[in-house]
């Protein structure tokens, strides 16, 4: 008799987790992203909440969001190439997941005893930006995988890349390629050089710590330029 409450509890927890994960198979909707632009993302809202709870908000300073939506054709081919080469070189070939990269990340996480390395594709990063926070957990990764799968079913690769390049974080309050190009180089994303594009691309893994003029960005962008197609 004593085991029944434990079994009931386990059943309840399992059912709750299954429902919590399962709802992502149908909600939130994805199809509207084919023709409409998201006004904000869960990640942007997360950053704003961080700001509101931080020291600068206490000084009465509001977080300024810099973002200007542009179609993919108005983003320099060099930046598109740089981001794909740096972040997800199999982007045009996979269906949302790079299983070899995921295995390597899983192995590194296992060796470190914590969830550190990501191994995420551009599609996975877009799903995370749109609907989730940076929380690192197995449960969130499963939800992210479901939303990535749905993105790949609903949208073509060009649209996925366009969305990603318009919502990716490129600094404190700087989102999207157009805002990043204007903020750091004083020009439109359409007019970026190969060198400028490479510097922006290697900022993406750590946009709050890296700037185009930092030593690590110069070093990494130099390596990236050698890998980028001409």
Residue ranges and their predicted role:
Residues 1-230:
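Juxtamembrane regions of bacterial inner-membrane/periplasmic proteins
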């Amino acid at each position: 008799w004593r085991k029944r409450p434990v079994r009931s509890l386990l059943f309840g927890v399992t059912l709750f987790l299954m429902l919590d994960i399962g709802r992502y198979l149908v909600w939130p909707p994805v199809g509207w992203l084919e023709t409409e632009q998201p006004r904000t993302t869960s990640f942007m809202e997360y950053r704003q909440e961080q700001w509101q709870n931080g020291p600068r908000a206490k000084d009465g300073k509001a977080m300024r969001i810099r973002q200007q939506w542009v179609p993919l054709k108005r983003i320099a081919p060099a930046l598109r190439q740089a981001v794909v080469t740096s972040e997800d070189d199999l982007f045009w070939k996979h269906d949302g997941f790079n299983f070899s990269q995921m295995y390597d990340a899983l192995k590194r996480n296992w060796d470190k005893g914590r969830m550190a390395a990501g191994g995420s594709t551009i599609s996975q990063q877009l799903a995370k930006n749109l609907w989730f926070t940076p929380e690192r957990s197995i449960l969130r990764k499963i939800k992210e995988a479901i939303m990535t799968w749905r993105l790949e079913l609903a949208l073509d690769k060009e649209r996925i890349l366009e969305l990603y390049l318009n919502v990716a974080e490129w600094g404190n309050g700087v989102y999207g390629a157009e805002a990043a190009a204007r903020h750091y180089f004083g020009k439109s994303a359409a007019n970026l050089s190969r060198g400028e594009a490479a510097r922006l691309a290697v900022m993406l893994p750590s946009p709050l710590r890296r700037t185009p003029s930092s030593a690590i960005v110069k070093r990494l962008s130099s390596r990236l330029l050698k890998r980028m197609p001409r």
